[in-house]
Amino acid sequence: EQEDFQSKLANEMHEYEQFSIRHFFEQVLEGELCVTEIYDEAAKWSLDLSASCYNLLFLYVQQEKENGSEREMNTFVHLQEEILQYFLRFPQYILFRWNVNCYGVLVKCDAEEMEDYTQRAIAQIQMNCESQNANADWYVVVGTPVERLSMLKECYDRVNHYGAYRFLYPQ
């Protein structure tokens, strides 16, 4: 019973942390915080946002067949874990959950490295999602790099604009 309580508490704390980080990124991307507030909030979550260039990448991924077998579900969960672990290995990427099927990645680095880190991220996602047994529907939307945190709202607006084209002009 004590273990159940501790497990439940740990899960609730993790959910709260994820919600809070998501809320923080919502505020940043909607332009609701000034730069000082962004850095203060980021410090609360031990997020280092220092860089000379920023970009956003949104990854939408879901299981190809909603009612797939347990094996297919496990394969899909493993796929998600592989993708997320890639981003967690590099300080140039800050990963956050955006919604049920979407993860956001803040890419932060020097301007001359931005194209490389962005392309590496896309290549890694593509490699994972197009593997023989991935069983995933996916797409990535990438913004246009900006030089200041205060400009992330513009980058986010472009990502939303680019993402809308997926529905207006499906492949």
Region locations from a protein language model:
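Generic structural signal for well-ordered alpha-helices
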Residues: 122-126
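Catalytic core regions of nucleotide second-messenger enzymes
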Residues: 94-100, 127-140
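Interdomain helical linkers/hinges and coiled-coil/dimerization scaffolds
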Residues: 1-121, 142-167, 171
